[in-house]
Amino acid sequence: RDNLGIIGASMGGLSALNMSIENPEIFGFVGCISTHWVGIKISEYLILPFRMKISGDESTTKAIQKYIKNNVSKLSSQKLYFDHGTVGLDSLYENPQNEINKILLGSEINFIYEVYPNHDHEPKFFGQRFKNILLNFIDN
């Protein structure tokens, strides 16, 4: 368990966190890269290829926060890592991430949270951070 973790980016970050909550006996660490806390409205999803911008779905964000709050005790023995950039879609993540941080801090859950200035929601930026994520899990 200590040597097995799960890492995901964007909605994959949500999936990684969910897998860890649902299977706490399996995963020792969880990495959430540019976690897509904000959801997406179906109307925004349909025009995304043309507009290339979303504002998110507050009800989805609140539901995710509630789910984590209700299950935070399942994360108590895991190493957690969260990050996001400051540009593009990633610019929407700071406030929801801060709410998640409050939940984790209130439950005395240990986690690492990093902000990467000028990083956008793109695989090339995720890749630049991957080594640092692994080193955090190995060193802690």
Predicted regions located by residue number:
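Non-catalytic cap/lid and distal C-terminal segments of serine-dependent acyl enzymes
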Residues: R1-N140
